[in-house]
Amino acid sequence: MYYGFDIGGTKIALGVFDSGRQLQWEKRVPTPRDSYDAFLDAVCELVAEADQRFGCKGSVGIGIPGMPETEDGTLYAANVPAASGQPLRADLSARLDRDVRLDNDANCFALSEAWDDEFTQYPLVMGLILGTGVGGGLIFNGKPITGKSYITGEFGHMRLPVDALTMMGLDFPLRRCGCGQHGCIENYLSGRGFAWLYQHYYHQPLQAPEIIALYDQGDEQARAHVERYLDLLAVCLGNILTIVDPDLVVIGGGLSNFPAITTQLADRLPRHLLPVARVPRIERARHGDAGGMRGAAFLHLTD
């Protein structure tokens, strides 16, 4: 059995998958925020419960936000303070007496989608998350591409390209990002960015679901906003595709639930690509909230 953990700032979610990659059981507990020992205990107790339930010693994979293992073997995860700065993989491997694998949660999302039965035909899969932030991952022949610093797929921290500024206006504000840089595309293409753009142009502080509801009702202002957002997304994605050239792009995160994101994006891309480039297949993520657990479990299928 394959055990996949999706660990965030508020919850530890475990999913148990069989050899056919089907979910058999899941459980969630709160993430301890202050005590590393309590954090380790929470993970180990879930593993012990799964081992007992299924009568086996399952493999363990963990997806977690941040850098899973720095050069000194410690985790960097600002949203999981109890474990950040600790040798999490080594400690769990020792306590559980098995090989524990860690990866960035966005890589686990991309891996989950790449291992979907409909998508395994594609050698290079790009996962793109349009949610609270913007991130993603790259999967080549079923394996995550992580890079030296585990920042492969941090698409949200690319800066706005020149043609985006031309489109939006040269006085368009380069917002300061939480990473310390200015003009990161996350500030404009995330769910929060979607709402910020609307307020910037129309001076109304609406949230993304409210704007989308207006769009569905045929509101002209909301429709103009979505057109502008999709044009901006196409410019930024075109730059990424020119570098990555994937066979498939799978879009997840809250904004992926808005059908226009996947249905109206492909037609906008050719003008932002090289003439010889082909637009990849673009699909909405298949596995929703289970994607993180699923991808983490499948870290043991990448050998």
Curated annotation (Swiss-Prot):
The lineage of its organism: Bacteria, Pseudomonadati, Pseudomonadota, Gammaproteobacteria, Enterobacterales. One of its GO terms (molecular function) is zinc ion binding. This is N-acetyl-D-glucosamine kinase. PROSITE patterns: ROK. Pathway: Cell wall biogenesis; peptidoglycan recycling. GO terms for biological process: N-acetylglucosamine metabolic process; peptidoglycan turnover. It catalyses: N-acetyl-D-glucosamine + ATP = N-acetyl-D-glucosamine 6-phosphate + ADP + H(+). InterPro entries: ATPase_NBD, N-acetyl-D-glucosamine_kinase, ROK, ROK_cs. Gene3D superfamilies: 3.30.420.40.
